[in-house]
């Protein structure tokens, strides 16, 4: 009887301790990220919700669907509003949206989100700071 109880105690101890080492992966949803090459005048952003992503690409708002599998990310069905803007801004926006369509992997390191394309290009975002509410 003592051996059975000791065996059960060991099983419960191992099961109980195994839960301590598992980490909940950080999520990318519900946060706004700003492209690190953004300027004060043009802030390129990306946000993630359930299966959708959206943001501002310098001139237009954009949106689409995404899927995650481990470190792999697929952005699809990318669309945007159709506003016109300065030529340079439109060219940068085109390059950015084209890169989004080629994203294959992602990394989340604290407040930094790195999207890597099939050609190895990295889009590095910082989590946007939430504005303080004035009292």
Give the role of each language-model region.
Residues 4-14:
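Sec-dependent N-terminal signal peptides
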Residues 17-135:
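Lipid interaction determinants
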């Amino acid at each position: 009887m003592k051996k059975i109880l000791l065996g059960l105690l060991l099983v419960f101890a191992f099961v109980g301790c195994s839960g301590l080492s598992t980490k909940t992966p950080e999520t990318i949803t519900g946060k706004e990220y700003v492209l690190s090459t953004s300027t004060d005048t043009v802030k390129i952003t990306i946000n993630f919700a359930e299966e959708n992503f959206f943001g501002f690409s310098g001139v237009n708002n954009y949106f689409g669907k995404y899927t995650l599998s481990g470190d792999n990310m697929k952005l699809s069905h990318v669309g945007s509003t159709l506003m016109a803007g300065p030529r340079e801004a439109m060219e940068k926006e085109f390059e950015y949206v084209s890169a989004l369509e080629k994203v294959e992997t992602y990394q989340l390191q604290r407040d930094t989100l790195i999207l890597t394309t099939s050609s190895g290009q990295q889009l590095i975002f910082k989590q946007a700071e939430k504005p303080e509410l004035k009292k």
